């Protein structure tokens, strides 16, 4: 008996093989997969059951998608009812599509049987048709009009249908790319005041006003100003725009990034979040009055907690702790550092302690210290030292100091006096009490929560560490890693140590620290400022260094006897300022009178200062300011004066014989006159043979008959005793090699620049112009 496979039977019945397998299993047939076989009787039974199951599906209502289509629905009703389902059914069939088309035509009258098998496909069809209907009724109508069977759809109208599908896709793209309704964007509120800088453009203003550049441009257009987003606007236009928005306008002051003083003042004058800070004390006084002993006693007696046993001072400033309060002492080597810092605007001292020996009284340096402290505007605490020595007279010291306005409180004044013995440590605590009392009266405060600012106490170049600077923090807190600008240098704080050489991570106001990480060595008294980012710090530091270099170039170089003639030649001076220092007054007067007797036309000697004694720093400072020369007779400069003179290129001339000093100055002044030149013949060459070269010209070969001829000499061509031409040598050779000079008795070849009319037996004479000294 012939058997039929399930998949062939399902293909015949146009139903899924899976459904047919399930139907066969319900009837108890031995069927497992679509490849299973059934007998002819079983196949006929399945055919009848499949046809009977398809009848109810024929009376099902039409899909919902066709309810909305009036005209197309009538056309569809006249067509076989099973064609729509056949199209979807054929889409699931894996056989030949031509066969499917034939099957459609062959089974067109079996709609009732096929409808039941295609129920699931009809549901999917309904959903698909509903989607097409939502995309547009016209597109759905076109799709429904093509329901002529799957095979006919693909073979007869496949090309046309593809065009329609593409058209549908195009319509979908147009619908997707169509401009959507703009969403309502909430603009950020306008600022109360528009802070602007002259030259801003629409884009910059848009960022500040939280508006688009297009809106700004439109606003300006309505106000009668036509601009683009990158065009600069003047202040008037920006203010008009702000008024149109109903807000105020304020021009922002442009701050020069290299103006370190501006940033320094901004931080120093910040009154927000103020807190108490330790006082900064400078101890000054005459030599040998016990200043160093007093400082050492204070340091050894009141070391900061945690530093006991480690008293080695690493920097020129330190802190001591007394009664749970800190005091910062600046250990300046002398008044010079104090003066230098004050001259640079770094008034870092809060209180000046003036040390005066009870057995010595007021001395010249004591008076100088008083003047410095008064000029700096700092209160003075007088310490009368060495009260333990025999012959000490503190009252006499007080009487002397009253002449300079330092009247003690006991006498009705406001100056604090403390009598101490630094050697034995007597009344040291009383001195510290007075310092803290004075600081309390002064109400010293700072803001530790901001970027640090302060001044340089000292700086040096260390072979191992590089640039090392001792800083005193005046405002804010200095941290390791902070980008910093110090004077004309910049960098990042790499390390930070306290006065005992111990590394710390931060330094609060009035704390002295030693830092590394700068790109150069700053000067004492320079301000330092910490910036928010390294980029700004670098820009400020580089700009300051550039300006300092330019200023140095513009500054007139100091005159010396060596460059005196060149200086006068440029017309920069017509007088010679001189400072005279000698060992005795008689020598001073004799030297001054002798110099003023020198008579040279157009030049005069200007004695701006004359005195007895060694050449001091003040003399060097005066010479620097006056562009003068210092002449010393039987005196020497002090080490500091010598160092400062070398730094500032000040000319110091030292003599032991008055005549030598006068002669040296006279020679320099004569050099300032217009020089006289005369011709000096170097040698002669006799031309003996000529050579022609197309690229070079005429080459004269000859013998040096007298003197010598040099490459840089001027030459004249003499023919029969008459000068034919004067010019310069073009080349000079000995054999084939270039020569700088050829001496008498040697042959050479030479050319003359821009001249070729050389003949045999001509004489070429070499010469140069020599300056004749003024007599």
Curated annotation (Swiss-Prot):
Q: Where is this region: G3?
A: 331-334
MF terms (GO), sorted A to Z: GTP binding; GTPase activity; translation initiation factor activity
Q: Which residues form the signal peptide?
A: none
Biased composition regions of type Basic residues, renumbered to the chain: 154-172
UniProt domain tr-type G: residue ranges: 276-445
Q: What are the alphabetically sorted keywords of the record?
A: Cytoplasm, GTP-binding, Initiation factor, Nucleotide-binding, Protein biosynthesis
Region (G4), start-end ranges: 385-388
Compositionally skewed regions (Low complexity) per UniProt: 50-64, 81-116, 128-153
From the UniProt entry, list the residue stretches annotated as the region G2.
310-314
Q: Where does GTP bind?
A: 285-292, 331-335, 385-388
What are the boundaries of the region G5? 421-423
Location(s) in or outside the cell: Cytoplasm
The coiled-coil segments of this chain are: none
Give start-end positions of Basic and acidic residues composition bias.
173-190
Ranges for region Disordered? 29-192
According to the record, the residues making up region (G1) are 285-292
- What Pfam families does this protein map onto? EF-G_D2, GTP_EFTU, IF-2, IF2_N
Q: Which InterPro entries match?
A: EF-G-like_DII (IPR053905), IF2_II (IPR044145), IF2_N (IPR006847), P-loop_NTPase (IPR027417), Small_GTP-bd (IPR005225), T_Tr_GTP-bd_dom (IPR000795), TF_IF2_bacterial-like (IPR000178), TIF_IF2 (IPR015760)
Cysteine-cysteine disulfides? none
Q: Which superkingdom is the protein from?
A: Bacteria
A single cellular component GO annotation: cytosol
Its family remark reads:
Belongs to the TRAFAC class translation factor GTPase superfamily. Classic translation factor GTPase family. IF-2 subfamily.
**What PANTHER family does the database record attribute to this sequence?**
TR-TYPE G DOMAIN-CONTAINING PROTEIN (PTHR43381:SF5), TRANSLATION INITIATION FACTOR IF-2-RELATED (PTHR43381)
Output the NCBIfam families linked to this UniProt entry.
IF-2 (TIGR00487), small_GTP (TIGR00231)
Q: What does this protein do?
A: One of the essential components for the initiation of protein synthesis. Protects formylmethionyl-tRNA from spontaneous hydrolysis and promotes its binding to the 30S ribosomal subunits. Also involved in the hydrolysis of GTP during the formation of the 70S ribosomal complex.
Q: This protein is called what?
A: Translation initiation factor IF-2
């Amino acid at each position: 008996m012939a058997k039929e496979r399930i998949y062939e039977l399902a293909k015949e019945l146009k139903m899924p093989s899976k459904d047919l397998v399930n139907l066969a299993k319900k009837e108890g047939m031995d069927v497992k997969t679509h490849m299973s076989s059934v007998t002819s009787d079983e196949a006929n039974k399945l055919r009848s059951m499949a046809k009977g199951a398809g009848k109810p599906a024929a009376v099902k209502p039409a899909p919902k998608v066709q309810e909305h289509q009036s005209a197309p629905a009538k056309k569809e009703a006249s067509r076989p009812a099973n064609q729509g389902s056949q199209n979807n059914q054929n889409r699931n069939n894996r056989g030949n599509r031509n066969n499917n088309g034939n099957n459609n035509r062959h089974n067109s009258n079996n709609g009732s049987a096929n409808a039941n098998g295609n129920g699931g496909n009809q549901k999917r069809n309904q959903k698909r048709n509903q989607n097409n209907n939502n995309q547009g009724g016209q597109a759905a109508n076109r799709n429904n009009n093509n329901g002529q069977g799957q095979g006919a759809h693909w073979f007869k109208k496949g090309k046309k249908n593809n065009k329609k599908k593409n058209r549908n896709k195009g319509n979908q793209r147009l619908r997707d790319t169509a401009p959507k309704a703009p969403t309502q964007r909430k603009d950020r509120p306008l600022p109360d005041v528009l802070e602007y800088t002259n030259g801003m453009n629409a884009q910059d203003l848009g960022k500040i006003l939280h508006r688009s550049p297009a809106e700004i441009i439109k606003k300006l257009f309505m106000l009668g100003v036509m601009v683009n987003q990158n065009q600069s606007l003047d202040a008037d236009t920006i203010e008009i725009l702000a008024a149109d928005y109903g807000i105020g306008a304020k021009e922002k002051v442009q701050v020069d990034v290299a103006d370190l003083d501006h940033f320094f003042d901004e931080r120093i004058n910040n009154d927000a979040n103020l807190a108490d800070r330790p006082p900064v004390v400078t101890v000054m006084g005459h030599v040998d009055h016990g200043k160093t002993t007093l400082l050492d006693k204070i340091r050894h007696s009141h070391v900061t907690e945690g530093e006991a046993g480690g008293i080695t001072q690493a920097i020129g400033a330190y802190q001591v702790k007394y009664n749970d309060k800190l005091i910062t002492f600046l250990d300046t080597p002398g008044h010079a550092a104090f003066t230098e810092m004050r001259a640079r605007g770094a008034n870092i001292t809060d209180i000046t302690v003036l040390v005066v020996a009870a057995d010595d009284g007021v001395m010249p340096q004591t008076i100088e210290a008083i003047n410095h402290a008064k000029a700096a505007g700092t209160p003075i605490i007088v310490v009368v030292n060495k009260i333990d020595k025999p012959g000490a007279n503190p009252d006499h010291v007080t009487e002397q100091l009253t002449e300079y306005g330092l009247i003690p409180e006991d006498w009705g004044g406001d100056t604090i006096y403390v009598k101490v013995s630094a050697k034995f440590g007597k009344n040291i605590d009383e001195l510290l009490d007075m310092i803290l009392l004075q600081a309390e009266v002064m109400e010293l405060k700072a803001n530790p929560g901001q970027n640090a600012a302060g001044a340089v106490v000292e700086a040096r170049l260390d072979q191992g560490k590089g640039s090392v600077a001792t800083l005193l923090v005046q405002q804010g807190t200095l941290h390791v890693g902070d980008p910093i600008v110090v004077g004309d240098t910049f960098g990042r704080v790499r390390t930070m140590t306290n006065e005992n050489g111990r590394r710390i991570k931060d330094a609060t106001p009035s704390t002295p620290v030693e830092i590394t990480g700068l790109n150069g060595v700053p000067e004492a008294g320079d301000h330092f400022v910490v910036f928010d980012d390294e980029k700004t710090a670098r820009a400020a530091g580089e700009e300051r260094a550039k300006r300092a270099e330019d200023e140095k170039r513009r500054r007139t170089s100091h005159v010396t006897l060596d460059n005196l003639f060149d200086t006068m030649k440029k017309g920069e001076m017509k007088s010679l300022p001189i400072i005279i220092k000698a060992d005795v007054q008689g020598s001073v007067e004799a030297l001054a009178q002798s110099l003023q007797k020198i008579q040279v036309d157009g030049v005069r000697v200007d004695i701006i200062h004359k005195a007895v004694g060694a050449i001091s720093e003040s003399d060097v400072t005066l010479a620097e300011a006056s562009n003068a020369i210092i002449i010393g007779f039987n005196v020497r400069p002090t080490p500091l004066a010598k160092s400062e003179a070398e730094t500032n290129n000040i000319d110091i001339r030292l003599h032991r014989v008055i005549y030598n000093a006068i002669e040296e100055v006279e020679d320099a002044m004569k050099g300032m006159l217009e020089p006289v030149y005369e011709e000096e013949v170097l040698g002669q060459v006799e031309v003996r043979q000529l050579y022609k070269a197309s690229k070079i010209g005429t080459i004269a070969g000859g013998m040096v008959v007298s003197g010598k001829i040099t490459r840089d000499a001027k030459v004249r061509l003499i023919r029969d005793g008459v000068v034919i031409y004067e010019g310069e040598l073009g080349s000079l050779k000995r054999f084939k090699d270039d020569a700088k000079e050829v001496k008498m008795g040697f042959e050479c070849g030479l050319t003359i620049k821009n001249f070729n009319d050389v003949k045999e037996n001509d004489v070429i004479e070499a010469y140069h112009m020599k300056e004749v000294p003024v007599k």
